[in-house]
Each structure stands twice: as C-alpha cells, then as structure tokens.
Amino acid sequence: GHHPGIFMQCGPVRHRVDARTQAAVRPFEHRVLVRPTAFQRLKPPEADKRLQFQALYRALIDDDARTHRICEDVVSCVREGRSPLVLTERNEHLDRLAQALEAHVRHVVVLRAGMARKERERASAHLAAIPRDEVRVVIVTGKHVGEGFDDPRLDTLFLTLPVSWRGTIAQYAGRLHRLSDGKQEVRIYDYVDLDAPMLARMFDRRCRGYEAIGYTVLLPASAIPGWPVDVILPADPVWKRDY
C-alpha cells in the first residue's frame, strides 16, 4: 500500500478514483436483483469455520432446486436479449450449470481456471465468433475472471455461489462495465441463502460492496411484506436496518 518507496518513485497522489463516481458517469444503470433461495442445511454446522464454509458450498452445489432456479433466470435473461456471465467458484458446479443450460441455449461457452492454453484459445475463439444477433451464455470460474477475461457484450452477472470480500465483488462486477452499443443496464443476480447465518452475514458484506461501487440493491416484492415462508429472515441487525 503506502510504502514510502512508492511515493519516492512515483511522487505524491494527484488524483483518487472513486467507484461510485465512475458508476454515475457510465451511460447505463447498475442494479442488483436479490434472489432469496429455499436452501436449508441438512446437517448441523461444523465447529471449525473453514470446514463449515466448505460444507455449505458442498450443500449449495448439490441443491438441485437451487441450480434449477438459477438456470431458469439465466434462460429468461437470454430471452430478453441479454448477455449473461454465469460465475461459480467450483468446477463441479460449473459443469452442472453448463449441462443444464446446454439444453436451452445454443451457445454455451465454458471458461475455467487451469484450462490448457490451446483449450482456452479454442473457447475464446468460439466466443469471439458468435454473431451479436445470436444468444450465448458464458460460464466461468472466479479464478478465470481474475485472469484478465474481457468481453464488452456482457451485461448480466449471475453470482451463483456466495462471496463476501469487497475487492472480489468489484472485480466480478467490473466485467460488466465495458462500454458496448445498446448497453442500458448492467444487472447482477445475487442468490441469497438466508437460512445459514454464515451465508446471511456474507450477504450483508456483499450489499456494502455493491453500494461502494455504485449499485442499487433491489429486493424481491415478496420480501416486503410477505417474505416466503420457507426462507428465514436473517437475525443480523444491519440487514434489518438497511432493508
């Protein structure tokens, strides 16, 4: 960060970039659509937080109803003419999403971390060759997004597994911010698993991350006042105060 050597080499700070200010001058709206899920933990949480997190990820990946709902939303967006980026943190989850979507979308392009160079080049060439008037879905792992992935057509992000660090949120959302003809709104679908306290707290942190980069967070109409009976409201007071 602020090591003296940086200032010695580069001089004093002349300008600071604010993410909210940048969002305000872009020629499109920035919105997050919250999608509460009916995910329920079947086992008591692990005492070790790291093991608990891994167990929750495993359960989320295995939740077929949750995956089906995500794919329904993706297909709906494609039919609107949107260009979605479906993002997951696990290769197994990526494969399940791809298999489900290939039955409904002609072009499903899969990019994952650890791909061989030639395999990655073939997938990138396939993506580049798809005409603008043909629908497509890009499915990636978070690690691949961090490897310089860039596609100006993207206007919708599906966050299919929970993350919380603000820098990760900014990096993922940034894939939507390239200017492209006809882009009027960028949209993030956030799948919220509120029955698990750890995941509810992660949602809290994501909301603060979205705000910090200029996004408006939109709750589903069912949350006010009739929250679905199979989804428990989080106990976190920050969530209740904000929403």
Residue ranges and their predicted role:
Residues 1-33, 210:
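Post-DEXD/H (motif II) to motif III coupling segment of the RecA-like Helicase ATP-binding lobe
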Residues 14, 21-25, 37-41, 91-93, ...:
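Conserved nucleotide-binding/hydrolysis micro-motifs of P-loop NTPases
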Residues 24-28, 76-79, 102, 128-133, ...:
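Conserved catalytic network of the ASCE P-loop NTPase/AAA+ motor domain
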Residues 45-89, 93-100:
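Conserved interdomain hinge at the start of the Helicase C-terminal
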Residues 85, 95-96, 105-146, 168:
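Conserved helicase ATPase core of P-loop NTP-dependent helicases/translocases
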Residues 138-140, 147-162, 171, 187-190:
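A short beta-strand element within the Helicase C-terminal
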Residues 156, 164-188, 204-207:
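Conserved SF2 helicase motif VI
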